[in-house]
Amino acid sequence: MLTKNTNNFSNSSNDPLNLYLNKNYAALANSDLTKKIDSDGNTVVHKMAKNLDHDAFDSILKHNPTAFKYNVINTANKRSELPIHKAMETLQSGGDPDHGFIDYLINGLGANPNVPDASGRTITQVNPTTYNPTNPTGSTNVPGITHLPSNAVNDQSVKQLNDQVIKNIRNLAKTAEDNINKISPKLGQSLRDKGVTPDSITNAAKNVVDRMPMIDKFFGKQTANQVGTVSQVTGGDNNVEFLRQLTNHYSTLRGGRSTSDRSDMNRYDSFVAKNKNSILNNYDRQYNDTFSSTGGKANKKLGDINTEDINNLFTDDAQNENSDNSMNTWGGAKKTYGNKSRSNDNSDNNDDSDDSERDIIDRRQTTKYQNMFSSQERPRERNTKVDEIYRSFVKKIMDLLGVDEETAKLYRSAIKIDIGNKNPELRKWENDELKIQEMEKIFNNKQSLQNALDKIDMDQIKSEMSRRRDESNKRRDEKRKDREEKRRQKRSQRSDTRKQGIDSVTSDEATSDQTQSTDSNNTTQTASKKRTRKSTTSQSRVGPNNYLRSEDIIISTEN
């Protein structure tokens, strides 16, 4: 099927697929390895990986050590499959238990095992072996792996993940200790005096892992009974996810580098080691925050689980102190946000507002906070890989042309703008990877770079850069003024609303006084009318000749 699809794409002797089939590795090493060779969007690297062709990869590297850059070894086809996915499919279909080729792709070529395909599959590490093509016996070797789809994690793989994380943490802590001792022996001794050693860090990690079942049981009951606030960490699979993320973070820093970066491995180890405590503390905070919000007092029981036992899981004073501080910080941040919002919306009348008005303000602020995640004005997510490649272009320009950093940055921006002007579609941020491919062609050698710069009008580029900066500043100023105007209008509306309320009360009081006055006048007039009628009635009872009228008798007034 693959051969049929490639017929329409491979009609040249210099085509990557033909070069590969003819084993012309010298020419293939300097060809475009990202070129599609079939209708499924596969590249020749996909085919080599599917064939588990270790020799082909090695032969290409001999002719061009930088042939398999990150965007080459991690090019996706139409189903979002990377070459490493194709290699994994071959291994699984053949039942081959030896996955050394996958280790080679990750550790030797920089394949990223954490990128999911269209089916959501990633490459996970579960069984330890050892492989590092640049230093097979070194202490910084990445543990080898048996690779399974991420949805195939079971109880056994959880245990293996736990063991793997503990080993990784110990290796990283040891590397960090060695680096600190080289940089500052005094600092290293100070840490040891405080009990910060690879052994203590490893024991702390084991303590967390050993308590996982109890923590899972606790949060499983919390979710089932719907007690208190729903935590961000619920259910029994969260320790699996945490361990997978930590392992992936470790393997990404290890495996996401090309062969030329192997000498810098200790630097990345040191980075991970420095952030290890932060990762573990954040993990502890999630649980401790939930204990505080759902457990109540320390001796309060939830079902058959005592929260005092949970709170005693981490007995180290420093850990408890960090957890308490982190809880206060987390809660304080939320409280500060609410207070700040309430102050902005009701700054002139905090003491006069009733509870219902505050509730309305709180709901409005909650809605605004939720809209932060769906607003189209929020900044786009940064592509860190693209940013790294952009930064690497500066060094490459400096090396090829021998210019300083500022000039190199100007040349890089000029080439980037020129490519965008020639192809407006490449200006869009979602096409950054395509733009990088075009730029890499220019940076291939000194001659191609110099030719590209000679065709660019630098004065025009500088003018355009200045114009873009001015437009960007103008947009920011307009947005700022718009926000200020909206806030001013809201304050004015609230002020008018309060004024209308006061006027309404005053009007009601005046109306009430007027009504009472009118009622009093009406009462007086009615009484007067009654008296008048009484007088009239008395006069009407005097008949002709001064006789008083009665119902039955007429009495004369004369003597």
From Swiss-Prot:
- Superkingdom as given in the UniProt entry: Viruses
Subcellular localization, as worded in the UniProt entry: Virion
Q: Does the entry feature the keyword Transmembrane, yes or no?
A: no
InterPro entries, alphabetized: Ankyrin_rpt-contain_sf
**Compositionally biased residues, Low complexity:** 507-527
Show the ranges annotated as biased composition (Basic and acidic residues).
454-501
Q: Name one GO cellular component term.
A: virion component
**Compositionally biased, Polar residues: which spans?**
320-329
Segments for region (Disordered): 315-360, 454-559
Q: Which residues form a coiled coil?
A: 433-495
- Protein known as: Uncharacterized protein L488
Keywords per UniProt: Coiled coil, Virion
Species of the source: Acanthamoeba polyphaga mimivirus (APMV)
Acidic residues bias spans: 348-357
